[in-house]
């Protein structure tokens, strides 16, 4: 199984979020800034739009994933994110 989605050499991170979540907005902004200049992308997914995701994560957002691997939750764990970025550069 692959670590995460890849599209033309570009690896996608998934940010599980919900509308009106300030922590989600903060994490999205920080991750986008840190990914700037890299081939990687960020795909936000609203957990409220999918009953299975809403049941799985409830209010436990934001969550940042690469494929099935969780990188961090609730706030950006900069050391963990930088470790992921080094491993995927």
Give residue ranges: language-model regions:
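Local sequence-structure signature of Cys/Sec-based thiol-disulfide redox active-site neighborhoods
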Residues: 2-33
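Short helix-capping segments at alpha-helix termini
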Residues: 35-39
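Thiol-based oxidoreductase modules, predominantly thioredoxin-like and allied folds used
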Residues: 40-51
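A short, hydrophobic beta-strand/beta-hairpin element that forms part of a small beta-sheet core
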Residues: 61-70
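N-terminal, polar/charged subdomain of small-to-medium soluble alpha/beta proteins
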Residues: 70-77
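Thiol-/selenol-based redox modules, centered on thioredoxin-like
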Residues: 81-89
């Amino acid at each position: 199984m692959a670590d995460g989605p890849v599209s033309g050499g570009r690896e996608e991170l998934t940010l599980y979020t919900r509308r009106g979540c300030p922590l989600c907005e903060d994490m999205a902004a920080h991750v986008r800034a840190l990914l700037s200049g890299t081939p990687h992308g960020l795909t936000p997914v609203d957990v409220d739009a999918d009953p299975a995701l809403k049941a799985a994560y409830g209010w436990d957002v934001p969550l940042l994933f690469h494929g099935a691997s969780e990188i961090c939750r609730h706030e950006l764990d900069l050391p963990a994110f930088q470790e992921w970025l080094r491993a995927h550069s």
